[in-house]
């Protein structure tokens, strides 16, 4: 189980934690930006669900309510709204990673070309 992280100060420890969760399929990364934004690049292995549709679309991923979910957008605002929406429907381990560049750095992942 992961607890909310309010300040990302120790990037190497956080990156190690995220990498461990992602490699063991205990976590998922979701890009909540618009499709137009995602076409400019997406973090490798992330899935795309626009923040306005997250409450409805999250069900197609068949996630457990306690599974770790890492969200990002352009600046952290929309991923913050998506975080609240997911918590309101019962997800307990949701983390807003902020903007795409910070999220990629924190996760130690590349930004790659989006393919549908």
Language-model segment annotations:
Residues 2-7, 27-28, 35-67, 77-116:
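Rhodanese-like catalytic fold shared by cysteine-dependent sulfurtransferases
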Residues 6-16:
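Sec-dependent signal peptide hydrophobic core
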Residues 15-23:
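Hydrophobic h-region of N-terminal signal peptides that target proteins for export
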Residues 19-20, 75, 79:
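Short linear Ser/Thr-Pro motifs
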Residues 72:
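Short, surface-exposed ligand- or partner-binding patches at beta-edge/loop junctions that are enriched
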């Amino acid at each position: 189980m992961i607890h909310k992280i309010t300040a990302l100060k120790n990037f190497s420890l956080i990156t190690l934690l995220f990498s461990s969760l992602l490699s063991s399929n205990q976590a998922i990364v979701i890009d909540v930006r618009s499709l137009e934004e995602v076409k400019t690049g997406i973090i490798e292995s992330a899935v795309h669900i626009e923040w306005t549709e997250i409450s409805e679309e999250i069900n197609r991923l068949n996630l457990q309510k306690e599974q770790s979910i890492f969200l990002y957008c352009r600046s952290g605002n929309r991923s913050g709204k998506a975080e609240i929406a997911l918590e309101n429907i019962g997800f307990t381990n949701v983390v807003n990673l902020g903007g795409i560049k910070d999220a990629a750095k924190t996760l130690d992942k590349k930004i790659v070309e989006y393919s549908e």
